[in-house]
């Protein structure tokens, strides 16, 4: 009966500015502050900081690293998310953030710790997607589910002022298999 209904579908969506086209992966505090000021001056209501804000051991300066390492890059954002959220508030707009928790790069702390969390066919070499390093996590695995939930829970728990999450899905499915599920539970 309610299939196809959009929650709050009768409400006007906020006018937003997403940082991606402005800076791509070169996220930094001055650029984010300037973009927030600009969208507020134009009457916008929401600023979304896109890809490029995270990474510790492996910094997100190209798209071949850091997916899975959802830690603020303090070299790019020395004052953390708190400062950006306050900047949005001072400009009278809301703050949003980009994540892609189902994805991982082979060059990431997450993959170093849990290579078995990537979708893969046992006995076959991993196939990489975008940038030659991207893979999807095996969401059949309860540990992966907990990890993904934890990303969102951690972000919103520490920063309840985050008003919007852009949950992206850029990685194509290359590895059709699970190291978690037994073979009889897989279709191949």
Feature locations, PLM:
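A sequence-level detector of short, solvent-exposed, charge-rich linear segments
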Residues: 14, 36, 51, 58, ...
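Structural preference for beta-strand elements that scaffold enzyme active sites
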Residues: 12-16, 45-46, 92-96, 162-166
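Beta-strand-rich recognition/accessory modules
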Residues: 1-6
């Amino acid at each position: 009966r309610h299939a196809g209904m959009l929650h709050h579908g009768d409400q006007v969506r906020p006018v937003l500015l997403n940082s991606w086209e402005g800076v791509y992966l070169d996220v930094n505090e001055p650029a984010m502050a300037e973009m927030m000021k600009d969208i507020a001056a134009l009457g916008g209501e929401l600023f979304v900081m896109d890809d490029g804000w995270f990474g510790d051991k492996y910094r997100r300066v190209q798209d071949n690293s850091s997916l899975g390492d959802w830690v603020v890059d303090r070299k790019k954002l020395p004052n953390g998310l708190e400062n950006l959220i306050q900047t949005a508030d001072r400009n009278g707009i809301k703050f949003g953030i980009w994540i892609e928790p189902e994805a991982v790069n082979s060059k990431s702390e997450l993959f170093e710790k849990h290579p078995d969390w990537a979708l893969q066919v046992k006995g076959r070499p991993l196939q990489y997607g975008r940038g030659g390093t991207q893979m999807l996590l095996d969401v059949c695995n309860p540990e992966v589910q907990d990890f993904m939930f934890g990303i969102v829970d951690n972000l919103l728990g520490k920063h309840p002022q985050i008003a919007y999450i852009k949950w992206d899905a850029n990685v194509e499915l290359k590895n059709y298999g699970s190291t978690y599920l037994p073979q009889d539970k897989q279709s191949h």
